[in-house]
Curated annotation (Swiss-Prot):
Complex and partners: Monomer. Homodimer.
Native organism: Rattus norvegicus
Keyword field contains Cytoplasm: no
Keyword field contains Lyase: yes
Name assigned to this protein: Serine dehydratase-like
Length: 329
């Protein structure tokens, strides 16, 4: 890749502007207008391409010769897609539990794939080791200012689509990159008064644990089926975010997240992974209504935006297996 074409690739964002549509079904459940930000239609399958694409483009401008990314799947696919666009070799380090379909997708993007450890944190150690090689750059799935800067583009799109600020933004938290990006975006567009409902599953609730403790907390293990939320420790930036905007942290059980995936499939005819189900459970499990009753959210919300963060770690067979495992009716 040479000359003007290379410069164009490095300048144009890799993410696409995604639809923001009101959901009749979820609005009926919530008793208020619910708008869905469909990040699951990103070309890399999730919102991750916003931040990671931006990061990789900046690293390419600085002369990076090889990218390496530890991932539960979604970040790796975003990094592999970005590397392929930039013509840079990439190594993706995944936990051994990663599905074969994700590995196939990564290899299809031309990535070298290494499977290491039980959870993401262990894969991340290997990625950091590889990043010490000359010319190699580690792509954090969530913990870098360029990642947050790229993810902030999502809020700029919300501002362009909505006439007025939403009553709340609902999102899932894993390592905290989406949360940090949304906070950055809200501050940028002057919507810092909009509360954020930050959803996690029990067993991957490192952000909730950190808020309760008032400091970063490392979970002993990731026991949730929502593997894409599986960072034992969130980014330190998330605690700062909770001071800059109103962030309401909520934890749901795996069963609630998986039931939300099934209901969303029935309602919207789209299949997302349990990590995304955690955000959808804010509506389906009545959490928004409870927060209103408790006075933590306004009793008269004009609308709510739920970020459908996407996900590549799911199939119809996996969903059925999860429903059986968790005894979901």
């Amino acid at each position: 890749m040479e000359g003007a074409s290379a410069e164009c690739v490095r300048a144009e964002p890799f993410h696409r502007v995604t639809p923001l549509l009101e959901s009749w079904a979820l609005s009926q459940v919530a008793g208020m207008p619910v708008f869905l930000k469909y990040e699951n239609v990103q070309i890399a399958g999730s919102f991750k391409i916003r931040g990671i694409g931006h990061f990789c483009q900046q690293m390419a401008k600085r002369g990076c010769r090889h990218l390496v990314c530890s991932s539960g799947g979604n970040a790796g696919i975003a990094a592999a897609y970005s590397a392929q666009k930039l013509g840079i070799p990439v190594t993706i380090v995944l936990p051994e539990s990663t599905s074969k379909q994700v590995v196939r997708r990564l290899e299809g993007e031309g990535a070298e794939v290494q499977l290491t450890g039980k959870v993401w944190d262990e894969a991340n150690v290997r990625a950091q080791e590889l990043a010490t090689r000359d010319g190699w750059v580690n792509v954090s799935p969530f913990d870098h200012p360029l990642i947050w800067e790229g993810n902030a583009s999502l809020v700029r799109e919300l501002k362009e689509s909505l006439r007025t600020p939403p009553g709340a933004v609902v999102l899932a938290v894993g390592g905290g990159g989406l949360l940090a990006g949304v906070v950055a975006g809200l501050l940028e567009v002057g919507w810092q008064h909009v509360p954020i409902v930050a959803m996690e599953t029990r067993g991957a609730h490192s952000f909730n644990a950190a808020l309760l403790a008032g400091r970063l907390v490392t979970l002993p293990d990731i026991t949730s089926v929502a593997r894409s939320l599986g960072a034992k420790t969130v980014a330190a930036r998330t605690l700062e975010c909770a001071k800059e905007c109103e962030v309401l942290s909520e934890v749901v059980e795996d069963r609630e997240a998986v039931r939300a995936v099934q209901r969303f499939l029935d309602d919207e005819r789209m299949l997302v992974e349990p990590a995304c189900g955690a955000a959808l459970a804010a509506v389906y499990s009545g959490i928004l209504g409870r927060l209103q009753t408790e006075g933590r959210l306004s009793p008269a919300l004009d609308s709510v935006v739920v970020i459908v963060c996407g996900g590549n770690n799911i199939s119809s067979q996996q969903l059925q297996e999860l429903k059986t495992q968790l005894n979901c009716s």
